[in-house]
Amino acid sequence: MKAMILAAGRGQRMMPLTQNMPKPMLKVAEKPLIEHHINNLKAAGITDIVINLAWQGDKIKDYFKDGRQFGVNILYSQEVEGGLETAGGIIEALPLLGDSFIVINGDVYTDYDVSALMQLHLQPGEAHIVLIENPPHNPDGDFALSHLPAESQKYTFSGIGRYKADFFKGLTQGIRPLGPILREKLNEHLVSTELYIGQWDDIGTPERLNQLNTRLEA
C-alpha cells in the first residue's frame, strides 16, 4: 500500500517561519515534521510514499531526494503555485497512488499507528477517516462519528484517512477542498470514521509549534 503526505500548503499563519521554508519542514524534536511521518509510515511497513509540493517544495525535495537514505521510495507530485487544496492535490496525484492509499496531512504531529488503516476492508468508492477530540482552535468539530446520527457531537478531522481511488471518481482536476466531499460522501454512507484518543497536534501557528516542542523536551 502507498501513502501520500500533503505538503503543498502555503503555511500563511506560520509566518515568518514559513517565509523561506515549507511548513512540513519546520523542526519538531529536532527533525522536520514530515520526517516523523515518513518514519511512522516506514515502521508500519509502508515504503512507497507520494509527497505533493507547491510552496518552497524544492526544500522538501532537496532534503529527502528519492527517499532511499530514509529507507523509503518517494515520488513527488508537483502542483501549481498556490497549491490545489487537499482534494485537488489528491486527485492530481492519483496516477501515482494505486487503488487504495493512506493520506496524512504534513502539518500535524501524531503517534497514530497507520497499521490499523491498512487492515481495513474498504469497498469501491469508500473512505475511512480518523477523528480526534476537538482542540481549542476548532471547538465545534467537523464530523460526527459515522455510526451515530448526523446531529450527534462533532469531532475534528485529524487529516489522516484511507481512500479508495474511485472515492474521487468524476471529480475533475483543479483547486478543490476535501471537506465538502467528505460531508457529501458521509451522507451517502461511503465514509466510515473512528475516534482516536492519543497524541495529535496541528502545527498551525508558531505558538503551537513552540508549545509542542516544549512538551516534547520536558
Locations of regions flagged by a protein language model:
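Conserved beta-loop-beta/alpha segment of the NTase-like Rossmann-fold superfamily
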Residues: K61, K65-D142
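Glycine-rich phosphate-binding loop at the start of an alpha helix
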Residues: E35, A87, G179
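Catalytic-core segments of class I nucleotidyltransferases/pyrophosphorylases
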Residues: I102, Y109, S115-L122, N134-H137, ...
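Small/polar loops that bind or transfer phosphate-bearing groups
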Residues: L6, A29, I51-L53, Q78, ...
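Residues at the starts of beta-strands that form the adenosine-phosphate
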Residues: K2, T47-I49, N73, E126-A127, ...
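N-terminal glycine-rich phosphate-binding loop and ensuing alpha1 helix
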Residues: M1-D58
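Phosphate- and divalent-cation-binding pockets in alpha/beta enzyme and binding domains
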Residues: R13, K59-D62, E92, D113, ...
